[in-house]
Structures are given as structure tokens and as C-alpha cells.
């Protein structure tokens, strides 16, 4: 089950710590009560710090990060930083393309996300994680799958983890 982090970009300091503590308790309790794996997605996050703060408070493997590559692309820090700081907690990926300004949900290859870099960072995780293509319908899915297979990204048409 995926939840948006809903962490406003201006949350820092004590406000961020309070938010992280409340959310960590909620997600942990929900995951354990219902036997769920919960993934918290970077949604409005301009950098990984809100999710890092959240995961400093979480001690269960039932709560993970859903890293949305498209959202990370238009954030204020490089994709490498998202993987470096959250990699051990990543349990799910959302894939869509954009031109670096806002969330366009374009088919992969139609924006300017560096998919070779994203694939390399995914491989460095050393484990496979579920992925969702958020690309606006069956045509976008077909275009994205063709793109992934042509380049051998994320284990399609090439080597797998």
C-alpha cells in the first residue's frame, strides 16, 4: 500500500521531527495491525530529508520508501542523493518521465529523466523491487515498456539483478 508523504517542503527542525514521529507511529501501527507492507512516496518532497527523518523513527521492515523517479527528477537535489540517503529503505519504485519542471507522467523516454542513471542506481541496490509505470494509459505503458526493453533498463530485455 502506497501513501504520499505529504511532507510540506518548509517542514524542518522541530516541526519535521514531530511530523516524522507522528507518521512513523501511524504507519507502523497500520502495517502491523493489518499485516501490510506500507511504502511512503516522495510526493511534494524537495529533498530526501523528510523521508530520512521518518525512517530514523521507523524500526519495522513493513514500512518502506516508494521512490517516485519523476518526482525526484524535478526536486532540488540529484537522483543520486535520493538513492544514497534512502536506498536501504526503498521497497517500491514509481516510474514516469517529465521535463524537470513538474509531474507530467510522460511515457519513459519522452522527457529528460536520465534513465541510464536511474537504472544504474537501481542495480546498485542489489535487489529487485516492485515498480509501477505512472504514464497515463495503455499507450503510455506500451511506449514505456518498449523503451525499457530496448535499453535493457530495470531488467527488461537485459540482465536482471
Where would I find each of the regions flagged by the language model?
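Histidine-acidic metal/acid-base catalytic patches
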Residues: 29, 48-67, 72-161
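Active-site acidic/histidine proton-transfer and metal-coordination neighborhood
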Residues: 1-64, 159
